[in-house]
Amino acid sequence: MKKIYSTLVALLATANMFAQGWPANYSGVMLQGFSWDSYDYSQWTVLEKQADDMKGFIDLVWLPQSGKCIETEKVMGYKPYYYFNQNSSFGTEVELKSLIAKFKANGIGAIADVVVNHRNTDGWFTFPAETYKGVTYQMLSTDICKNDDGNKTATQATKDGVSLSQNYDEGTDFRGCRDIDHKSANVQKIIKAYLKFLKEDIGYTGFRYDMVKGFSGTHVADYNDATGVKFSVGEYWDGNESIINWINKTNKKSAAFDFQFRYNVRDAIGVKDNKIVSSPNWSKLKSDYNLMHDPVYRQYAITFVENHDMQFRSADEPLDPLKRDTLAANAYMLAMPGTPCVFQPHWRAYKQEIKSMIEARKLAGITNMSNYTNKMAQTNCFANETTGDKAKLIVVVGNNTKAYTPSADYAQILEGYHYRYYLSKSAETAWCNIPSGEYEAGFRAKLTAVSQNSNAKLVYTTDGTAPTAKSKQVATGSTINIDETCTLKVGLLINGNVTGIRTYNYTVKAFEPYTITVYANADQVTNWGSAIYFYAWNSSETFTKAWPGTAATATKTLNGKKWYYMDFKIKSKDAIVNIIFNQGNGTGKKQTVDLNAGNSTKYYEITTTQSNGKYTCKDVTADMPTTGITAAPTIDNTASKDNAWYTLSGMKMMQKPNQPGIYIHQGKKQVIK
């Protein structure tokens, strides 16, 4: 009986843990792994290559909605059509699973963007029928809220002779899609199956629920209970009281984005609606109008300073970006309780600085439930002290951060534009101001002794061995040169003993541009013509002439088929090539759907299948034997002693390539990893 009782207690404890909505005392940091129209930077294949670099800093990555939409052009996914088809504008389901597996191998969880307030249809009322584990799921017209789309849907339903739900929308109406009736048993069954699919089959760790103002929080609690998900956060874009009410509606089974924390930061910086409206007033950060300040709700506070709905998109869609002091805003957020969510454009622009901020947060042991104390709140200077599980961290932000000086119990570890970090000396640790990562050139790193012993020195090695009293020794505040790939280990030297060792892994490697080749075969399409136009671009440049692009007349015969091809130069490590094949200008000319060729050589067969009048393509790269090379460049090692390296398309490299891939060297294929 005792054993049975213990088992029941354990099961109840486990269920309660998942019912928290967001773990208590959680020390992780989340990254929003996309921004608006970030099709280049948020491809699953691109993000997968970044997993190693995120390790130890990022614990969760919120991914863009990964389901297939009905549109053929690239879309962000906020008008979902398919649930169980996970091929999206960001990559295939296979690539998505590979990304999530790579994340997990690096201790990173993936958060799915779950858009279930509304759903797109084919016409007014037709939802797709999808089969999962032998069961076919399909929403019906009777699953659409009675007053959807300002009653326009009801008017159309009367014309078409179809029925809608008898239940009214529980919240805000989303125009342009069908608002789903979450009271419907059919809807609940489908969404629960969908969420289990995301968690169990795709591998997601948690859910970010989109537009939860549109339906009751009780449904989120129900869905999370059915799925047993560990992490859940809702987008309830409203005032603090309304957000708290929503969290309570979920029975605290979901966290929420702390929108008012974001507005505190925006107002302190003095910007609004893409305009600078005032000089900064950093004292506005001293606010009780947010989730983060409340000891009862800070566990459920997902703090952020900008996201895809606030960033500058275009002159026609300026929205509400920060515009200035992005680093100071992140420094403040990353030193405070709640679970911080870093925006991808900030991560890309200031990765080194943000990594160091995260390292300081983790070193101090700050969690989503840590307590903090205000130390200064002036117009030009604001300081908070946060008490972590391991040490205390003081963040100072403002136009004059020198206005605040902490006690002698603190050591300054970071300094940047309008921000400073001070770590309590009780941490007894060495510190380096350059975080682990990849760098394209050497740098100088500053070492700091964070110790209550004023005589503490620093000892370090760069070969990965643990430093000893006999290792290279420097005083606190000294800088050292890092000129090549190495593992830096630095520790405190006090009375002949080495403690507080920190490890930093540096890869110093300049990016070397390289060339990829994209091949197209149009044999399946009748009357395509004697040329294929390639229109290719990415977020930084257009590779070809303006639409319809550049005509590719050069061909190669591979596997008995004629392939048109074109070379493209990859100029940065995260650059990709988007491409459309077409017949040129003119009425009735054929073209394909948008394709993402990534940053490696690809082979596409243009098929006869069309999507909204555009031809689809099949990626057959994996089917091409020896990647389609019919003959390697001839190298006469005995006579010419030519030691050059060549790409698979035959381009001669100036030196041995640094970029991973397959190359031809001395007449043989060589793999650079």
What are these regions (language model features)?
Residues 20-36, 46-55, 65-67, 72-79, ...:
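Active-site-proximal helices and loops of the catalytic beta/alpha 8
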Residues 26, 69-101, 131-181:
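Aromatic- and acidic-residue-enriched carbohydrate-binding clefts of CAZyme catalytic domains
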Residues 92-128, 132-134:
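Substrate-binding cleft of carbohydrate-active enzyme catalytic domains
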Residues 399-401, 449-457, 525-530, 540, ...:
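Short proline/glycine-enriched turn/loop motifs at strand-loop junctions of beta-rich domains
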Residues 426-512:
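Short, compositionally stereotyped local motifs that mark structural "simplifiers"
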Residues 466-477, 524-572, 584-594:
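Aromatic-rich carbohydrate-binding modules that target alpha-glucans
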Residues 479-487, 570-575, 657-659:
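Surface-exposed, short loops/turns at beta-strand junctions within beta-sandwich domains
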Residues 627-673:
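C-terminal outer-membrane/trafficking sorting elements
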